[in-house]
Amino acid sequence: MVMRQNNRTAESLRPISIERGVQLHADASVLIRMGNTHVICGVSVEESVPPFMRGSGKGWITAEYGMLPCATDSRYRRETNGRSGRTMEIQRLIGRSLRMMVDLETIGERTLRVDCDVLNADGGTRTASITGGALALRDAFTKLHTTGLLEKMPEIMPVVAISVGMKDGQALLDLDYVEDSSADADANFVMAGDGRWIEVQSTAEGRPFSHDQFLAMADLAQKGSAELLQLWRDQE
């Protein structure tokens, strides 16, 4: 059995905590901590939609992602001249995942913008952003309903995400930065509350991985996602 930092097994998540309502001026917010990765997810509701959605009767959910300068071991420069390709890729992943939570026709022609800001980065920032952002969105929908802006509470599909890697033939759940930087392969799995996959991103780093190794990573992601879904239910 592989033993990792903090006596984690290959199948163990890092310690997780959820703090809700941490931003005074957000419509909803969540601070999610997964080990030493900490991400604050704030939701802003705008009573309009992008031009391509106008007149459709549908709402829109989008996301922005960024890291604070001291989130990493060496100062991360603010992206003042436009977002990098990596940042754009991550925030599109977050947005696609979060749009799976609801039928956009049930939220009216309004935009819910989810800002995911990484306070501390130790691997898995995009997956933590998805899980935390989804929890914050749920609270935002509840607020819209209780304040009368939404006549009916939309049916919400829980959404969670987790990383898995392959190191020396062993699948590892919820990689920290050291593990991620030395993995032979890594993957991000986004799961809906009914157990179906929303998105899977998997890349070989040191060497190609086999079909069986991919299935081992998927099985581990399924286990970790089930634990995150239980966390979601515990927050209800």
UniProtKB/Swiss-Prot annotation:
Matching entries from Pfam families are given as: RNase_PH, RNase_PH_C
Q: Where does phosphate bind?
A: R86, G124, T125, R126
Known EC number: 2.7.7.56
Keyword Lipid metabolism carried by entry: no
Question: What enzyme category does the UniProt record give?
Answer: transferase
Q: Which GO terms describe its biological process?
A: rRNA catabolic process; rRNA processing; tRNA processing
Give the signal peptide range.
Answer: none
PROSITE patterns for the chain: RIBONUCLEASE_PH
Q: Which reaction does it catalyse?
A: tRNA(n+1) + phosphate = tRNA(n) + a ribonucleoside 5'-diphosphate
Keywords for this entry?
Nucleotidyltransferase, RNA-binding, rRNA processing, Transferase, tRNA processing, tRNA-binding
- InterPro entries membership: ExoRNase_PH_dom1, ExoRNase_PH_dom2, ExoRNase_PH_dom2_sf, PNPase/RNase_PH_dom_sf, Ribosomal_Su5_D2-typ_SF, RNase_PH, RNase_PH_bac-type, RNase_PH_CS
Name one molecular function that GO assigns to this entry: tRNA binding
Q: What does this protein do?
A: Phosphorolytic 3'-5' exoribonuclease that plays an important role in tRNA 3'-end maturation. Removes nucleotide residues following the 3'-CCA terminus of tRNAs; can also add nucleotides to the ends of RNA molecules by using nucleoside diphosphates as substrates, but this may not be physiologically important. Probably plays a role in initiation of 16S rRNA degradation (leading to ribosome degradation) during starvation.
**What PANTHER family does UniProt report for this protein, alphabetically?**
EXOSOME COMPLEX COMPONENT, EXOSOME COMPLEX COMPONENT RRP41
Quaternary structure (record): Homohexameric ring arranged as a trimer of dimers.
Q: Which family does it belong to?
A: Belongs to the RNase PH family.
Matches recorded under HAMAP family = RNase_PH
By what name is this protein known? Ribonuclease PH
